[in-house]
Amino acid sequence: TLMRSSAASDVYKRQEEMYLVDLPGYGYAKVSEQEKAQWGKLIERYLHGSKQLRAVFLLIDIRHDPSANDKMMYDWIVDQGFNPIIIATKLDKLKRSQVQKQVKAIKTGLKLLPGTVVIPFSAETKQGRDEIWNLVDTEFLGKGTEE
């Protein structure tokens, strides 16, 4: 996953073209409120301090309607001047017939801005991975989708 419940900020490099920065998650981390507040400051400094930041991805569990934390994080990211790309994780845990219903629940629950992208994704089956990388390549790296 790209955002998770650990205190570390990890950086992943893709073919010398970009860095993917994995910031601490907020959901189920078993840390103090004080530490969560420190994470918030870290994330805010990163969002405002990075001159090369091109996109923000918000990972949300597709199995559930957006939580209060999901809504708060989405609104906060928008308030920081970004329209995050929503990655709806754990796709492999849903029946195929439930996917569109849950995507709609995410869109409605978060009151997404027009044009916000929601990509269902499974780390287990890799479903949605190509769609994410194609979006990154075309929208943020200025490439076509052919490899």
Say what each PLM segment does.
Residues 30-41, 68, 97, 101, ...:
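Residues at secondary-structure transition points
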Residues 94-147:
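Canonical P-loop GTPase G-domain recognition
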